[in-house]
C-alpha cells in the first residue's frame, strides 16, 4: 500500500485549517466593517442631509416626520438615550440649530422618525412644519445623553412634560423591547390638554403589553368631562406616594419645559453640568446621584 495515502491528509489539514482561519478572519472583519459603515451617523462634526420621505398630522400642532437614511440598509447609529442636532439656514444666512430625539427604534433600518410640535415663534419647529416630501434637513450626531444598560436599576421613574416625552419614550421602548431587561418603569407625563399628549397610542400599547413592568399616569391642566387621568400638575404629594424612593437601585429621569425642571428637579447648568437637584425632588430627599435631567 502506498505511503502517500497516509501522508497526504497531514499536508491538507493544516492548509484547510489555515484557509478556514483566513475565512473566519475575513468574515468577522467584514462584519466589523459592515457594522461601522451601516450607520448613517457616526459622531463628529459632519452635517448629513436627509430627505423627507413622508409626514402626517398627529394633532392640530404636531406632525410625524419620516426621513430616509443614507442607505435602506443603514441604521441611524443612535443609541439609547441619544439625540441628533438639526440645522437650517435662514433667508438672512443665519444658522438655526436645535436638538431632536427620534421616536423610532434605534435598530430601525432605512428611515428615522421624529414627532415635532410646532411652537409659536419656534424657528426650527416652524421650519419642520413647512417641509414637503423630498425636502432635506441637515442632521449630525449622535449626542449621547445617558447610555442605558439593561438592569442598571431595579426601578426607574420617568417624569416628562410636553415634547420632553421623546427621550423618555426612547428609554421606555428600549427597556421593554428587551425581554432580559427587568427594570420596572413608572412614567408620569404632563400636558396642557388631552390633544397635547404625544405618541399616546405607542405609550398605551407598551403599558398594555407590559402590565407587570410599566405603569403610566397622564396629567392634563385642562381636562374634558370624559378624562380618566390626573388633572393639574405633577406635584409633591403625588410624587411622594408614587416614586420608588432615592436609592442606588433606582433613578429618576426628567425632561420637559423650563417650568417643569424649575418646580421638580432644578435646571441644568449646561449640557455637560447637571447641576444640583432642587425643587420637589430635593424636598423628597433626592440628590444628583438619584436624578438625571435630559
From Swiss-Prot:
Record localization: Mitochondrion outer membrane
One of the record's GO cellular component terms: mitochondrial outer membrane
GO molecular function: cytochrome-b5 reductase activity, acting on NAD(P)H
Superkingdom of the organism of origin: Eukaryota
Cofactor(s), names only, from the UniProt record: FAD
Annotated FAD-binding FR-type domain residues: 45-149
Keyword Magnesium: no
Reactions performed catalytically: 2 Fe(III)-[cytochrome b5] + NADH = 2 Fe(II)-[cytochrome b5] + NAD(+) + H(+)
Any one Pfam family match given in the protein's UniProt record, by short name: NAD_binding_1
Regions that span the bilayer: 11-27
PROSITE patterns: FAD_FR (PS51384)
EC number: 1.6.2.2
BP terms from Gene Ontology: ergosterol biosynthetic process
CDD domains: cyt_b5_reduct_like
Enzyme's top EC category: oxidoreductase
Keyword DNA damage: no
Function: May mediate the reduction of outer membrane cytochrome b5.
Protein name per UniProt: NADH-cytochrome b5 reductase 2
Gene: MCR1
Amino acid at each position: 500500500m502506498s505511503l502517500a495515502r497516509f501522508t497526504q491528509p497531514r499536508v491538507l489539514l493544516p492548509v484547510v485549517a489555515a484557509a478556514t482561519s483566513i475565512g473566519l478572519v475575513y468574515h468577522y472583519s467584514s462584519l466589523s466593517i459592515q457594522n461601522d459603515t451601516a450607520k448613517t451617523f457616526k459622531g463628529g462634526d459632519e452635517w448629513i442631509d436627509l430627505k423627507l420621505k413622508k409626514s402626517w398630522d398627529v394633532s392640530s400642532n404636531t406632525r410625524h416626520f419620516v426621513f430616509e437614511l443614507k442607505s435602506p440598509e443603514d441604521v441611524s447609529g443612535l443609541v439609547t438615550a441619544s439625540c441628533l442636532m438639526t440645522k437650517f439656514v435662514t433667508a438672512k444666512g443665519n444658522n438655526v440649530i436645535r436638538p431632536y430625539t427620534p421616536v423610532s427604534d434605534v435598530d430601525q433600518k432605512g428611515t428615522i422618525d421624529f414627532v415635532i410640535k410646532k411652537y409659536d415663534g419656534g424657528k426650527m419647529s416652524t421650519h419642520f412644519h413647512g417641509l414637503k416630501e423630498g425636502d432635506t434637513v441637515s442632521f449630525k450626531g449622535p449626542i449621547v445623553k445617558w447610555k442605558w444598560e439593561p438592569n442598571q436599576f431595579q426601578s426607574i421613574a420617568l417624569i416628562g412634560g410636553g415634547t420632553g416625552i421623546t427621550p423618555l419614550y426612547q428609554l421606555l421602548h428600549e427597556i421593554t423591547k428587551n425581554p432580559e431587561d427587568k427594570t420596572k418603569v413608572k412614567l408620569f407625563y404632563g400636558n396642557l390638554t388631552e390633544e397635547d399628549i404625544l405618541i399616546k397610542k405607542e405609550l398605551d400599547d407598551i403599558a398594555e403589553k407590559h402590565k407587570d413592568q410599566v405603569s403610566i399616569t397622564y396629567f392634563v391642566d385642562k381636562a374634558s368631562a370624559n378624562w380618566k387621568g390626573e388633572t393639574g400638575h405633577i406635584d409633591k404629594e403625588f410624587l411622594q406616594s408614587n416614586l420608588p424612593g432615592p436609592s442606588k437601585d433606582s433613578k429618576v429621569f426628567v425632561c420637559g419645559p423650563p417650568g417643569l425642571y424649575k418646580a421638580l428637579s432644578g435646571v441644568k447648568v449646561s449640557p455637560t453640568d447637571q447641576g444640583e437637584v432642587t425643587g420637589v425632588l430635593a424636598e423628597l430627599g433626592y440628590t444628583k446621584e438619584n436624578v438625571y435631567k435630559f
